[in-house]
């Protein structure tokens, strides 16, 4: 076993036909499940496979195949020696500002590619960010992903109830409103906060308390973020239209990484974190 998530377990396996290691995602099916519910889960996994396969990006794990056996689907994917950002923080503690900014820029690059393809990730969090041994950064687990156009046309999934990790759900999702591109960016902001501070800004003793903290914008100002402070605070704004755009975020992440590399680095002025239209 190389990973576990809310939807399934990822196993390391060997492809005898092509002589290569692969990762195989097994879906967790509840013990008592109706046929209709099983179909929903299978459809979600198929959606994940299609969403991932549609993205030609170095920050996305390649999908090799989708197999259905005894009514249960499995995704066969590229295997990479890696560990999650969550695991890295748990083992080594908070990241430095420069490294966090670089990882954030890589995750943002995947999100921009996904958004350009009409796909929302909807579950950006440290456990879904993988750091490979060669330094490559990947955004994985598109299990809650939805295609924006198809979701709106079908009238489903975009308002599919509250799913995901409560501490990384943006306010509009907690309120049961549709996901937006800005929703993924908010979750990126919460992930960056966790990377530099070592804990989630909205994690509380139970899920409802976490969601209430999200709705109230109740989090402590980051103390270790340095030059990332305006990025984090700009992404965690309550209203989607007030958040930093992807373009502004990319620019500020580059500036933060450059500034953090200099001796005596300090945070950029908060005024620099302006919301953008894109």
Describe every region a protein language model picked out:
Residues 1-6, 10:
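Protein kinase glycine-rich loop
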Residues 107-119:
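Protein kinase catalytic-loop region centered on the HRD/HxD motif
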Residues 70-84, 88:
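Conserved short submotifs of the Hanks-type protein kinase catalytic core
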Residues 103-104:
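Activation segment signature within eukaryotic-like protein kinase domains
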Residues 28-54:
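AlphaC helix of the eukaryotic protein kinase fold
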Residues 66:
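Activation-segment/catalytic-loop signature of the eukaryotic protein kinase fold
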